[in-house]
Amino acid sequence: MAARKSKGLTLMEKMIRLETERLILRDYTADDLEQYCRLKMDAKTMYYLQDIQLHSFDEAERDFAAVLSDMASANRRFYFLHMELKRNHEQVGGIGYTVEADTPVGKLVHLGYFTYPAFWGRGYTTEALAAVLR
């Protein structure tokens, strides 16, 4: 899933997009600000991730700007993807990983996901995780 950093590619050409039977997993774009904020501020969705839950639009906006900045970085560390249904583009949640360290055998990453409760128990996260790990 790691973005290839080839010289001469634009940010749009470097953007990650994965598809599964039911989902589209893709890098966030500036147009996703409202959805990102709603997801990261949702108390039920973030119940088990309270350390990264956001509590105001201003806080969410700053966090989202950092996400977009990291995506454009030559040393990208955060690979968190917008997760949406193929059939209607409804946001399911987010999934991805953070590169914690480079080791002799590869990158050490911290994997995470968060989905809206309406999508729990339907296999979406399992499906997305399989695509991310490929």
Over which residues does each language-model region extend?
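Glycine-rich acyl-CoA binding loop
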Residues: 121-126
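GNAT-family acyltransferases
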Residues: 2-118, 131
